[in-house]
Swiss-Prot record:
Region Disordered, annotated ranges: 239-263
Pathway(s) of this molecule: Purine metabolism; IMP biosynthesis via de novo pathway; 5-amino-1-(5-phospho-D-ribosyl)imidazole-4-carboxamide from 5-amino-1-(5-phospho-D-ribosyl)imidazole-4-carboxylate: step 1/2
Record's protein name: Phosphoribosylaminoimidazole-succinocarboxamide synthase
Record-linked HAMAP family: SAICAR_synth
Highest taxon, organism lineage: Bacteria
InterPro entries membership: SAICAR_synt/ADE2_N, SAICAR_synt_PurC, SAICAR_synth, SAICAR_synthetase, SAICAR_synthetase_CS
GO cellular component annotations of the record: cytosol
Coiled-coil segments on the chain, per record: none
Catalytic activity: 5-amino-1-(5-phospho-D-ribosyl)imidazole-4-carboxylate + L-aspartate + ATP = (2S)-2-[5-amino-1-(5-phospho-beta-D-ribosyl)imidazole-4-carboxamido]succinate + ADP + phosphate + 2 H(+)
SUPFAM superfamilies per the UniProt record, alphabetical: SAICAR synthase-like
Source organism: Chelativorans sp. (strain BNC1)
EC annotation from Swiss-Prot or TrEMBL: 6.3.2.6
Record flagged with keyword Ligase: yes
């Protein structure tokens, strides 16, 4: 595939001009970052795993009627996506106390929350992505009240789906982060799920051992990041069961595509 014009490069992905108007190519890098890139390493194979896991999840979201920017996977590291106007918010949905919530409120990590909690963070690396309220969001025009309602409704639906998906393979969904975008279709606009959903953006614990299968392994210098991501892919049926782990180049089962926060 010929390289197209680079549109944007973030901490873990690069966006290129797509083959058709209104499309982009999303490339997954091997960079692992934490604390808004204060900690950074290149981890061989991470981008391939995140691309494949995110594809699997977004395909399922599309199938059950949760709108996303995802069109199809192009290769091991790239996806074709719809171009959207990103809402400058990171939406964090929490089911179990962990990370900044546990520290901020003095709650023991692992405590099941009374109900799922949705938090908003303003996307601004220079400010360390500060937590904001709905009042901030509407006052500064980052999103309208109706858009906030739509984002929260999508977040709840995604949480319901992911909780069941991971529970079925012995994984507890502690929390996750998504981004949303405005998708313009003629004169009509709707809010869709964008960015990625992968072990980079979710906290995932083995339901029996509580082993961490997510980016906390990198944040906390635990090691075994790629092996943990491979385990998630294996349980979801993405990795070949008979293939031993190879951190530098995981072997993935191909499929036919259907028609960083401080959290």
């Amino acid at each position: 595939m010929n390289r197209r014009r680079r549109i944007y490069e973030g901490k873990a992905k690069i966006l290129y001009e797509g083959p058709e108007p209104g499309t982009l190519i999303q490339f997954f890098k091997d960079d692992a970052t934490a604390f808004n890139k204060k900690k950074h390493e290149v981890v061989d194979g991470k981008g391939v795993l995140n691309n494949r896991i995110s594809e699997y999840i977004f395909e399922h979201l599309n199938r059950i009627g949760i709108p996303t920017h995802f069109i199809r996977r192009l290769n091991m590291r790239e996806q074709l996506i719809k171009e959207v106007e990103i809402v400058p918010l990171e939406i964090v949905v929490r089911n179990i106390a962990a990370g900044s919530l546990a520290k901020r409120l003095g709650i023991e990590e692992g405590t099941v929350l009374p109900r799922s909690i949705i938090e908003f963070y303003y996307k601004a690396d220079a400010l360390d992505d500060p937590m904001v309220s709905e009042e901030h969001i509407t006052a500064f025009g980052w999103a309208s009240p109706q858009e906030i309602d739509d984002i929260m409704a999508l977040s709840i639906r995604v949480n319901d789906f992911l909780t069941g998906l991971f529970l079925g393979v012995g994984i507890q969904l502690v929390d996750f982060k998504i981004e949303c975008g405005r998708l313009w279709e003629g004169d009509m606009m709707r809010i869709v799920v964008a960015d990625e959903i992968s072990p980079d953006s979710c906290r995932l614990w083995d339901i029996n051992t509580r082993d961490k299968l997510d980016k906390d392994r990198f944040r906390r210098d635990m090691g075994g990041l790629v092996e943990a991501y491979q385990e998630v892919a294996r349980r979801l049926g993405i990795m070949n069961e008979n293939e031993p782990p190879k951190p530098a180049g995981p072997v993935l089962v191909s499929s036919k595509p259907d028609g960083e926060t401080r959290h």
